[in-house]
Amino acid sequence: MSNTFFAPLDEQWEPTRATLHAYAKGVGAIARAHAVPHPKWWHISLKVRPNGLVTDNLPVPSGGSVALRMDLVGDSVVIESSDGTASSVPMTDGLTGTEFADALIAAVANCGLEGDYLREKFVDETPREYDPQVATALMGVFVNANTVLERRRATLGDSVGPVQAWPHGFDLAFEWYGTRMEQYEEGGEVQAHPAQLNFGLYPAGRAYFYSNPWPFEGEALLGVELPHGAEWQTEGWKGSVLYYDQVAADPAAETKVLEYAAAVMSAALPTLEG
C-alpha cells in the first residue's frame, strides 16, 4: 500500500491549517443557510474530491445550483454555478475569518443566493497566514485519509454515513449506526438516536486518528487493549485515539490504522447493538 499519507506532519504547518479551518467555517455557514437540510446535519459538511473540499449543491431560488470548493492546490475558494459561471476568493491575502466569509457571502449573492447567516459560526478577527506548499501537502493528507476511511466504511454494510470534513472541527470522519436506541431530552423534547461509532482523523496539534463509541460503556471497554499503541481516551471526551506520529513513515501504517479501527469496533459492538 502507498505510504504517502503517512509521511510525518510538520508542526510548522499549523498556521496554514488554522487558516484553512477558519475559512472552512465561512464555507460551512453558507452551506448551512442554503443546502437542502439533512436531519443529521450532513448538509453543512464538505466532501473530499481530487480538486478540493466541496459543499453539497446549493439550490438557487430562481433555478440551478451553486457549489463552493476549497481548492487547497489552487489556493482559493471557487464558487461554481450550474450556469457555467465561476468566481473565486483567494486564500493567500491574509484575510481574517470574518473578512473571508464576508467575501464568500458577496460572491454567492452574485449567484442569486442571499440569506441570514449565523455569523457566530465564522466571526474571527485573527490575522491569517497561508503557505501554498503546506496547503497542497494538507490536501494530500485529506485525500489519502479519505481513501483509508472509505476502505473501512466499505466493510460495514449499509448502516453508515458518508465520509465528511466538518467545518467546525476541520476533521474528517464517518459514522456507523448500531441497533441500540438511546433517548435523551433536547430542547424540551425527548428524542431517540441510534448508538454509533465514528472513525476519523483530527489533523491539528498532535494529530490523531479517533474512533469513539456512543454511548461509551467504560466498564466494557477500558479493559480491552488496543493495537499499535492506540489507547482509550476519557479526559475531556470519551473514545479512543491512535496518534498519527505513532504510525507516520511506517510502511505498514495504513494496515495498522485499519486494524485499530476494527479493534475498537470489535470491543464496542456488543454495547451498540440493541
Predicted regions and their residues:
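Long, hydrophobic/aromatic-enriched structural stretches that serve as scaffold segments
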Residues: 46-120
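Aromatic/basic-lined ligand-recognition segments
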Residues: 127-203, 208
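Glycine-rich, often proline-containing surface loops adjacent to acidic residues and nearby aromatics
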Residues: 75-89, 118-133, 235-246
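TerminUS-proximal long segments
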Residues: 235-274
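Secondary-structure boundary elements
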Residues: 106-117, 144-159, 218, 269-272
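Ser/Thr/Asn(+Pro)-rich, low-complexity disordered segments
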Residues: 60-69, 99, 232-234, 240-248, ...
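Low-complexity, glycine/alanine/valine/leucine- and proline-rich hydrophobic stretches
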Residues: 193-240
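N-terminal ordered "arm"
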Residues: 2-65
